[in-house]
Amino acid sequence: MKNKLLFGILFFIGFGLNGQELYNPQTLYDAPGGVFDLNFVREMDIVFEDPNYHSVLVNSFFNAPSYRIPATLSYNGESYDSVGVRYKGNSTFCLPNDEGNPKVPYNIEMNHFIQAQKLENLKKIKLANAWMDPTFAKEITAANIYRKYLPTPEASLLRLNVQGNYLGLYVNTEAVDKQFLQKQFNEKDGVLVKCDPVQVFCGNNTANGNPDLKWMGADSANYYNSYDVKSDHGWGELMELIEKINFDFDNLGDILNIDRVLWAFAVNSAILNLDTYNGYYVHNYYLYRTEDGLFQMIPWDFDNSFAGAILGWDFFDPMAVYNYDTYGNQYAPNERPLLEKLLDDPYYKKLYNAHLRTVYIESLMDTDAVRASINQLQATAYTAVVQDENKLFSMGQYSSNVEENLWTGLGFGGIMSMINRRNAYLSGLQTMFMPTPEISNMN
């Protein structure tokens, strides 16, 4: 049965459902000077032996997605031989590739060909091209908010040179892999599921899927297009979770860290990251089952935060995105069963409201602090952005999209304009001003 602990203790002390201690980010993130230090723009060089590497990697992206080719990687004065490289992404690969632009996302596996090879203790490097972010700041700004409340991949900026030529400025995003799990949970061998459909944005005849946690029957094959089990096993455990969500909700807390899910939903909603389970598109999360038997929700891929490239999702009323309902009332019944069932429960809805209010107060109300952080990041990145001839947007848009929306083809949400309008919406919710409990005389 779900443990209904004292709400005030949950909100102020930091202990979650089932007695599990909530996440403390201050002890886990990268030390100054490391790969994810935001005070610097790192530089990486990749040299392929095969001069036709690009056509090989483009072909494998569509026909053999896990195929990698060797390259020599240089970073911070060190050279690494025979790293395994493939292209990654979905729309962020397809859109530049369709235009003949070489600035596509990279996935680099340090130990693919040489066992135990690492780059500053990392086995995998994931480079996002910030293709739909004029500011180069949305992924990192969002990650810095998520990490206050959830186990969250780190992100930093990196100059990438390929075959001796500057390809562009990339966002270096931490992989959700065994190293991440060890860092965040002090364990790494549980079931890990990437909740992302298999279809390719520009692929022909690719299967459709939707990781919405609906029950699709007892055959695991029904789930293959919607989920990607990264561990050696896990389909049975995933289906057990989905079955409980849909048919045994009262006992869901026995298998899911519900408090962590509610934190994820709260941050998604507060910063309008609509590429999420309770956003416009259902994806971009992992589920990891820890040794205590609970699945943990892990957010990832934040480039569409602050409305991102989804600003114009409602063609007839594009500004409606700022008032995107925080409780999922815009969805059809059973469209998002986990969200629907949690927020139909009075206790979990109260806990969700508390988390939403916390994110609003701690991370969005002080707009001067948010702006200062973005300005510092952009100042650090400025030269690398100027020299990036493969970027999609102009330097004027690099600056202006921080403060205001950009309408060109798609709508690209401005970071501060989104925060200001979202704050206005959130401040109008009665739940934002409910009195908080006071705790005293605790032994």
Question: Where do the language-model regions lie?
Answer:
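Extracytoplasmic
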Residues: 39-43, 68, 103-105, 122, ...
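A conserved alpha-helical element in kinase catalytic cores
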Residues: 131-151
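Short conserved beta-strand and strand-loop elements enriched in small hydrophobics
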Residues: 68-75, 158-161
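Bacterial Sec-dependent N-terminal signal peptides
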Residues: 1-21
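Middle-to-C-terminal accessory/interaction subdomains
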Residues: 22-25, 32-35, 39-41, 52, ...
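Internal "kinase-insert"/substrate-recognition segments embedded within catalytic cores
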Residues: 105-115, 122, 129-130, 148-157, ...
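Conserved oxyanion/phosphate-binding beta-strand-loop segments in alpha/beta enzyme cores
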Residues: 71-129
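Structural recognition of the beta-strand scaffold that forms the well-ordered cores
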Residues: 45, 84, 105-109, 124-129, ...
